[in-house]
Amino acid sequence: MTMMKSLLGAAASVALTAGAALADPALIFDLGGKFDKSFNEAAHAGAEQFKAEAGVEYRDFEPTSDTQGEQAIRNFASRGYNPVVAVSFAWTSAMEKVAAEFPDTKFVIVDAVVDLPNVRSVVYNEEQGSYLVGLLAGMASETGKVGFVGGMDIRLIRKFGCGYVQGVKAANPDAQVFQNMVGTTGAAWNDPVRAGELTKNQIDQGADVVYAAAGASGLGVLQTAADNGKLGIGVDSNQNHLHPGKVLTSMVKRVDLAVYNAFKDTQGDAFTAGVQALGVEQDGVTYAVDDNNKDLITPEMTAAVEKAKADIVAGTVKVHDYMSDNSCPN
């Protein structure tokens, strides 16, 4: 019996050690899938960059329902993974509960704030990046009508839309902006067919540039715009390559940076908790120009958007944050 106990104890010790060695950091994605070519894929890119540079493996999990977040966070924490990174406001309550239960584990949440001493909260000034692409949309539009298709109808996505409207109006005060949301549940992040239908409706009303902030649903926006000879605007990742010459630009949100820094800081014993806000000044949000869209961006547009970036950093242009008062001035 004593020998059996020793063998079992040794096996358990080996299993725990192997788990920690092979999968120290852990990453939980938002709904929509790891390879959504948008938000989740940006997070994945940050994890892969860390893995390539540090030679450290990580584990990840792709939830398929709103109920799986807490289970995944607790599972990783209980198995010794550190840090545990969750990329979505949807996991806020789960993070609050589990992080309190594991005070010695480091946690990171993206797109939400959890006020605990072992949690880093990374939020973005999406309104600033959306303002920049809105400015470009307003300058590129020939009809004076542009569109916005959001994913799930939540305050965060209205923040994108509000920043976009402000940028469009800065370029053309008389412009008309059509806005639609794909849905009200997590399924709205992964419904490109519905997003495409909304885009076609906006195009039928005269929109010639449509901005998608809808996760994997946004692929339907870009596809529909391209199919109808109009311009799309990507989000989160640089999506210009998806339809070369048909994507005006992408509002790049550096989710990869949040994940990479979380993994790296923990490995390097440099982890700090608290809120990190990433905007234009921190290169947390920006617009994308590359070989796929450079011919769509005129020198005048470049000058205008670069001036807007400088003015935002200087504080002479203040982009209203919808989430500050649940309203949009335009």
Predicted regions and their residues:
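A residue-level marker of the well-folded mature domains of exported/periplasmic proteins
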Residues: A23-N330
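Sec/Tat signal peptide C-region and signal peptidase I cleavage site
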Residues: T17-A23
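Hydrophobic helical h-region of N-terminal Sec-dependent signal peptides
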Residues: G9-L16
